Amino acid sequence: DRIALWLPNTPAHYALTFAVWRLGATVVGVNTRFRAKEVEDIVGRSGAKALIYWPGFKDIDFAAILAAIDPAELTGLQMVVAHDVDGMPDVPSQVLGRPVHRLSAMLSAEPMAADHGGAKVPAQIFTTSGTTSKPKFVLHAHASLEEHARRVAVHWGVDADDAVFLQTAPLCGTVGLVNLTISVAAATPQVIQTLFDPVEAGQLIKREAITHAIITDEVLVRMLEGEADEVPYPSLRVVAAFGINPPLEEHMAAFERAQIKAFNAYGMSECLAYMALRPIDVPVDERMYGGGFVVNPASGIRIRNNETGELCVAETSGEIEVNGPTLMLEYADNPEANANAWCEDGWLRTGDLGHLRPDGCLVYISRINDMLRLSGFLVSPAEIEAELEKDPAVDQAQAVSINTERGVRAFAYVKLSGAGSFDEAALKAHCRAQLANYKTPISVVPIDEWPLAISPNTIKIQRAKLRDKAQALYDSSNK
């Protein structure tokens, strides 16, 4: 059985996660930023038997979102559970044609003595974008989550007697879930932010004497700039800041002045966050780049030249392949994706570009297929492009990512069909209504011709050139 949790980070979300695992069922994580199309697809294709949500969270109009979902697409859904808290809007007796139960009423039930979980029992499904517009379902068993949590906790020092962890990553993703499990494995207190707010985060760090956190480098720099003291967070020792963006040296120097050890890492939903970690007690230039050493000695990383099919020697870049106990069981219900992902000897193709140093340290470079990392989530450009191409005026769309003062954002180019009038505001409004807000392009710009790379076998759009052009256009208009 699968249970969809469409919830923010709350104690109830934590309790429900462990409750589902104890039942021997599987959690399907659903981002609260998702809207009708995404929720319908994930809950429907996963076959989730129950959907649990918080009707009054963040003033989100959940009723309108649910009303836009076709109940017939949710063939497995049997019930809806409302996380009822003070001030929650009235909940109807039925949603999507299914009965609604209140979570508070369930708490009066007798505790279940049995534990149906187990090492090989499926525990968690993460959704991850692929080369098509529909996300894949990454299925993990209990064993990969538990063993990994214990090792990461030790490596990161979360097992220290005075450790307190600040959870800022959403629990629906691999980073947030691993953060939860490492705190539990180490019996370390965790402070939860339901919605990440940098000002509140700074206050919590001071008030709760937080020692460990995951905060992107851009946000942490802004937090430090807003403080009068050079060392505003004396308790904060270690921050995972993977996804570090330029200017690397300036950001890391700011962290060092604040006596914060920031480090990078490598991971993905398929092999879990923090599969490889940069050492903490090493010079700054050894901590700032993506990659690291495997946390579990039973794990392996190798690099393959996809043109020749041969494995690469040290310092030679190619596709990263991984193996070991942190790997997913499979892409659930997706034979085609599994066939493409696994090597014959059981190693997993990541779609990432990188190389190994002679000492075995992984150096991560980028996604091979130019996936977009927006608001900490990996997003397929095809997902954004498909929505833009629904407009009669758009013949073809291409989405890339650019750096802005508010972080990495999507930027789209469209070739017009001539069948209608181009309306940038309407296109962005459509994306905002159908997709999570962070997937909405910051700009949609018409283009006459795509930059192409022509080879004997294929003709490919040069996304790197589009990205450079988009960045230059944005920079020139925001001087």
Which role does the model predict for each range below?
Residues 1-37, 44-47, 168, 378:
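Conserved AMP-binding/adenylate-forming
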Residues 5, 34-41, 51-53, 213, ...:
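AMP-binding/adenylate-forming catalytic core of the ANL superfamily
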Residues 23-101, 416-420:
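Structural core segment of the AMP-binding/adenylate-forming
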Residues 116, 123-147:
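Conserved AMP-binding A3 loop
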Residues 146-164, 172-212, 226-227, 270:
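Conserved AMP-binding/adenylation subdomain of ANL enzymes
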Residues 185, 210-214, 224-288, 300:
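Gly/Ser/Thr-rich phosphate-binding loop
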Residues 294-298, 310-341, 379:
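Conserved ATP/PPi-binding loop(s) of AMP-dependent carboxylate-activating enzymes
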Residues 309, 447-470:
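Flexible lysine-rich "adenylation lid" loop at the C-terminal edge of ANL adenylation domains
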